[in-house]
């Protein structure tokens, strides 16, 4: 495999940025660009990073050898200052050397291909990163630690243990030994099915990471939608202006509050306009109402006609009305709105945020130990069905060849969970959901 690199931190100005590089031969460049002879792996070195045009930055460098790295290949990481010019220069240098840009999940994919992680552990890396709740993070980390895969491998061995008696009964049917009865096949299958059902129940299945919930702010121009958007974020993400029609596109970001995570979307002020760009923004806002999970109509005065129009578009989804700018002498009866608040001063914001987060409350994890994806659940169902079908055939004295095939299919389902045999398309589906640099 080629040498690949990735920026593992966001591509925006910050205090630091981190680059990861992996692949056979990648350490050969260290003497030239860092003046560093690889001596002690997993040691932090402070060096000047030098490109063809001179010094790029004063950086930290750590390298890892082969099987002792995350990917199972020679690797190194660069910790530089987080300036855009510095990041661009480092990217240019790595491309000049001949390194390729890594794809999504490339580093974890290589870790799986080099037998550093099982497929279910690799998936748990993404689950841990995407977790927005502590209880979900806990079960994802349990899976990442290998407990989930170890249990699946254990059940696979037990399936093989039963299957060998069934196969023995087929291959040595003329022997005096009764492989089915003396081997306790039916009893073993009954216990196996019960234990496997208990294991499946110990897995937390969540669609939380598959479909992010969204809250859309709509309303007339200059009602304070962008100010409310920024207030929920805690920083200025959307442009705020006294001029109507400032927001012309959808602006999206994510909020984590009270153990709930949801996306918030600022939209163009809704009004009739001849400005083509603003008109397009209004159409975007109205169209987004059908897709959002919660619609929040923001006003700075009573507007019954627009309120009714927006409520009709929201259909049966939660529709909340907000009277903003209560710090001013607004022309509105607070009693006809769900919330009265000030995005500027923060008055009334807590009650509003609590309401939104309560709409997205998730089922608690409870005593469940592992994180299971929908892919795993489908395979678990297939495995349990195959085990039960095999037991039914054996109890009925039917063709043991078919019972043995059911047991083989049960084992295949378990192998697919941990990635004993995987197709390129499956790996693509899994790792394309990862972020770049992981």
State each model region's role:
Residues 2-11, 134-256, 273, 291, ...:
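C-terminal-of-GTPase-core extension/linker across diverse P-loop GTPases
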Residues 75-78, 250, 267, 301, ...:
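Generic detector of well-ordered alpha-helical packing
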Residues 46-65, 245-273, 294:
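Switch I (G2) and immediately adjacent beta-strands of P-loop GTPase domains
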Residues 1-138, 142, 146, 320:
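A glycine-rich (often HGG/GG-containing) alpha/beta subdomain
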Residues 278-301:
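Inter-motif core of Ras-like GTPase G domains
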Residues 12, 24-25, 65-69, 83-85, ...:
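Conserved nucleotide-binding/hydrolysis micro-motifs of P-loop NTPases
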Residues 264, 298, 322:
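Generic enzyme active-site microenvironment
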